Curated annotation (Swiss-Prot):
It comes from Pseudoalteromonas phage PM2. One of its GO terms (cellular component) is virion component. Pfam families: Phage_spike_P1 (PF22188), Spike_JR1 (PF22464), Spike_JR2 (PF22465). Receptor binding protein located at the fivefold vertices. Signal peptide: none annotated. The lineage of its organism: Viruses, Varidnaviria, Bamfordvirae, Preplasmiviricota, Tectiliviricetes. This is Spike protein P1. The gene is I. Monomer. The C-terminus is responsible for receptor binding activity. The N-terminus is associated with the capsid vertex. It is found in: Virion. Keywords: Virion.
Amino acid sequence: MIVKKKLAAGEFAETFKNGNNITIIKAVGELVLRAYGADGGEGLRTIVRQGVSIKGMNYTSVMLHTEYAQEIEYWVGDLDYSFQEQTTKSRDVNSFQIPLRDGVRELLPEDASRNRASIKSPVDIWIGGENMTALNGIVDGGRKFEAGQEFQINTFGSVNYWVSDEEIRVFKEYSARAKYAQNEGRTALEANNVPFFDIDVPPELDGVPFSLKARVRHKSKGVDGLGDYTSISVKPAFYITEGDETTDTLIKYTSYGSTGSHSGYDFDDNTLDVMVTLSAGVHRVFPVETELDYDAVQEVQHDWYDESFTTFIEVYSDDPLLTVKGYAQILMERT
């Protein structure tokens, strides 16, 4: 009779039947076969593969062990079994995507039923096995595939990937000074050419607070003709659309400010660090200076939507769910 078993990695398949012929019809890799006689003793232990037949050995039960999770098929009985090579055509197709994060990580687990996997990454990606390593951007034991290049994996073993060692995600870098802006809505800020970028909040962060940060520099000494020791107040902030990028309502997020009680700024670096709670999907972010200082108006005629004394050097996040470098598209075929 033909026996079909679905086994987990390390599992045994045992069949109690008298016979003297055994044929492995379907299997991936090596199996360990044990055959037992009428007295319960082990009459045979050997490694077998797909297509192997053992004839003329009397047994009352057989046991097969696999190192891989897979479906196996075998013949046990007195009659001989005529083996025919199994088709390699796929019977199951599944598509999904994998978030690409920092470090060497698993892309595909070991899967004995996997026939092939077609993969496309939006960023340069290195592919390798369990021995692949990466240190300071140098990858050993992996092959590079260019961004947008589709490639196939035809092995059933585990597959690792590497795209970056960066543990943060930089959304935007700026060299120009931020503009002064009040919360007058998205349309008004865009009409006045306030710089922005879009952030795509994943479903896992829908309504969940996450950290959004910026390295911020304030420099006012001698800028735009301002006196070297003029006191200037600052309060950098993010204005973020409440809904998607077409929503006009903006939410203000800020974490620090300084009133003009000092003798001017000269490369005073700070970190704007806020906890943001947004719905899943795309939101528009405006990094702005919200404090229009009296002296800036009186001495150098600054006004709303002019360049301020504040520069957002880079806006970034170290939240694990936002440090995704992209999503690999995978089409999986199984036998």
